[in-house]
Regions:
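ATP-binding Walker
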Residues: 264
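Short acidic low-complexity segments
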Residues: 302-311, 553-560
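Conserved beta-strand scaffold positions in the cores of enzyme catalytic domains, especially
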Residues: 257, 283, 290, 319, ...
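N-terminal pre-P-loop "Q-motif" helix
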Residues: 235-254, 261, 269, 507
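Walker A/P-loop NTP-binding motif
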Residues: 251, 267-282
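Conserved helicase motor core of SF1/SF2 NTP-dependent helicases
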Residues: 323-325, 336-635
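Pre-ATPase regulatory/linker segments immediately N-terminal to the P-loop/RecA-like helicase/translocase core
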Residues: 2-55, 59, 100-243, 247, ...
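Conserved helicase/translocase P-loop NTPase motor core
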Residues: 304-337, 509-511
Length: 635
């Protein structure tokens, strides 16, 4: 949320990007020029050291991602790239249309009825290129510097069709309708905008505001203003911990943190903060406030309708993603404080520190909301492996989040934790509450005992009465295997996202069988989700289920944060003699997985493999043995 007052403009040197072309192995270099704090009285070593460290990390992350793709291009054939999901060929254009936001959309279908479009390397939100299927070189080029004629964003995806929202209204050649291809692009604008934000942070040309001093220079956080009365709250149903969080945010001079465990109503708190801020601004200005969103949907048409920047400049409250906050529409006259009065960043624990500064530089006051026990941002190692960020609070590594840095420095002085959750049955919540939140969250009475059979039209049976179900596969011959292309019902599928992912066909079949039992009991398909822990397993399950149940949500755990369903089925996938569990031992990922379900959580797992992989997993299976309905199915 922002309040506008554009008046200044930033300056600085970002550096340069060098990309060599061709289909041979390539080396990508982004040159960040380290900043010297000696020449500027407002450029403190405590800030320049962090900025240089952050910039080098971002530079390394970006280069690793590009070099990984370059390696794939140099070692995999075009057929292998397609089979691995980085490209799709044999597509035809089924429809072109203008959507409600005046953007052009293209709906693609498989040209052959025996192919399912199940690439998991290209997800909703990915930047892709649409091109002539005959142009093989295009399929083997993934660089934004080698852009084909038509680019867009995947807006929806299913086993039988793909919807792409185009970035421009360019005309698509007629001969593409019968045969075209889609390939994944590397999108490096986020890296550039993070570096621009860090440049602006370090080259700030005036005396440092309290926000900078509190975050980096050891200043004490301060709070002003009277305490809010119960009658002051717009949402009178907020609980006391939620009201305390609103109070902290409204009275903070520079920064406040809101720690929102799963289901605790963090969004309601942020809405109340925005309402309170609007009330305050109305008192000060005596005017009403306009609201707008930035980035998507666009406010432009080919006929020359009003532009995004013009719309935004007429509003005082703006909603934006962090990435769009660094775009032209919100760049304004300055990259610095004074553009807005307050910035609120939701899910701040999923953003790198440099990413948060894209928006945070636009106001003297910052409110961060998130949960450090849920998903962190991910970065690439030099070997191409994905690593979840976050380290110990004391070490302050370059890949930590701004939320984590401030919490580590100031703790409870600037932070409030929401303590009552309104989503999960108490048995579903219990492991996370015990192991991660020190028993500081409790289930509200309205949800503590609710189960599926309490829903209208759902019959009562052993499944719908049980909040927890464990489908135990140990000793059943249901084992994992490495991913690859496969066939379901005679159709070819693409099931890969890179060098290593795992599938478990037995677990996939058990997941679908369990879903069918819930449906037979009257549970609505829209109230059910399947969340596997591996992308290849997602593709496998989509091949089994999406054609029969197109409304059934099937997605990977790492895309499920913030979502909830009445019933959730988790496929753990891993089952092997060596008891290797991979990233199942990532406690934050497991916490997200376990806290999506409201009334019914079914876990499909080989306990002999998974239960010994990590102390958190051990605690989980101890809890399941005590509280769950345990079944020993055979496929």
């Amino acid at each position: 949320m922002y309040a506008r007052n554009f008046n200044r403009r930033g300056r600085g040197n970002l550096g340069s990007t060098s990309v060599s072309r061709g289909l041979t192995p390539r080396s990508y270099v982004w040159s960040w020029k380290p900043v010297n704090s000696g020449s500027d009285r407002y450029c403190y070593p405590a800030i320049t050291d962090v900025v240089n460290q952050q910039a080098q990390f971002i530079e390394r992350d970006r280069n690793n991602a590009l070099n990984e793709m370059a390696h794939l291009l140099s070692t995999m054939s075009t057929t292998e790239l397609r089979a691995s999901g980085y490209a799709m060929a044999g597509l035809q254009i089924a429809e072109q249309r203008i959507n409600d936001y005046c953007a052009k959309e293209v709906r693609l279908e498989a040209a052959s009825e025996d192919m399912l479009l199940l690439s998991t390397a290209m997800r909703i939100g990915e930047i892709v290129r649409l091109d002539d299927a005959a142009n093989d070189d295009v399929v083997r080029s993934f660089d934004l510097d080698v852009v084909g004629p038509v680019m867009g964003t995947i807006s929806s995806q299913g086993p039988l069709e793909l919807m792409i929202t185009l970035r421009t209204s360019q005309k698509i050649p007629a001969h593409w309708s019968d045969r075209c291809s889609v390939s994944k692009l590397i999108f490096d604008i986020p890296f550039k905008r993070m570096l621009i934000a860090l440049r602006d942070l370090v080259s700030y040309p005036w005396a440092r505001p309290p926000l900078h001093q509190v975050v980096y220079l050891g200043a004490t956080p301060r709070f002003y203003g009277r305490a809010l009365l119960d009658s002051d709250f717009v949402d009178e149903s907020l609980n006391q911990s939620q009201k305390d969080a609103v109070q902290l945010a409204i009275t903070a001079n520079a920064i406040a943190l809101i720690h929102g465990p799963p289901g605790t109503g963090k969004t309601r708190v942020l809405i109340e903060i925005i309402r309170q801020q609007i009330k305050l601004m109305r008192k000060l200005s005596g005017t009403s406030l306009g609201v707008s969103s930035s980035g998507s949907p666009p406010h432009t048409t080919s006929a020359g309708a009003i532009s995004n920047s013009a719309v935004i400049r007429s509003k005082q409250v703006v909603l934006s993603s962090l990435l769009n906050a660094g775009g032209r529409d919100l760049r304004g006259d300055s990259g610095y404080c004074g553009d807005f009065d307050v910035v609120i960043i939701d899910n701040a624990t999923q953003a790198f520190e440099g990413e948060s500064w894209i928006a945070a530089l636009k106001a003297p006051k910052l409110i961060l909301a998130g949960d450090s026990n849920q998903l962190y941002p991910m970065f690439k190692n030099a070997d191409g492996s994905a690593v979840i960020a976050g380290g110990s609070l004391g070490s302050q590594p370059p890949h930590m989040t701004l939320f984590e840095r401030v919490l580590g420095k100031h703790g409870d002085k600037v932070s409030r934790t929401l303590q009552i959750q309104y989503r999960m049955h108490a048995d579903i919540m219990q492991v996370s509450a015990n192991e991660l939140y020190k028993d500081n969250i409790v289930a509200d009475g309205s949800v503590a005992g609710h189960v599926l059979c309490d829903l209208e039209h759902v019959e009562t049976n052993e499944y719908t009465r049980a909040p927890l179900v464990l489908l135990e596969t140990a000793g059943r011959g249901i084992t994992e295997s490495l991913h690859g292309s496969g066939t379901f019902k005679g159709r070819t599928t693409m099931m890969s996202t890179g060098p290593e992912s795992w599938i478990n066909t037995g677990e996939a079949q058990l997941a679908m069988t369990h879903v069918e039992k819930l449906l037979a009991a009257g549970v609505d398909v829209n109230d059910i989700a399947i969340f596997p822990f591996y992308d290849a397993q997602v593709a496998l399950l989509k091949g089994l289920g999406e054609e029969r149940y197109p409304e059934l949500e099937i997605g990977s755990v790492d895309t499920s944060q913030g979502r909830e369903k009445e019933a959730v089925v988790l496929s753990m996938v891993r089952s092997n003699p060596g008891k290797e569990v991979g990233f199942l031992k990532d406690v934050r990922l497991m916490n997200v997985a376990l806290t999506r379900a409201r009334r019914h959580l079914c876990i499909i797992a080989d306990s002999s493999t998974v239960s010994e992989g990590d102390p958190f997993l051990t605690a989980l299976f101890v809890h399941l043995k005590s509280k769950a309905l345990i079944l020993h199915p055979s496929t």
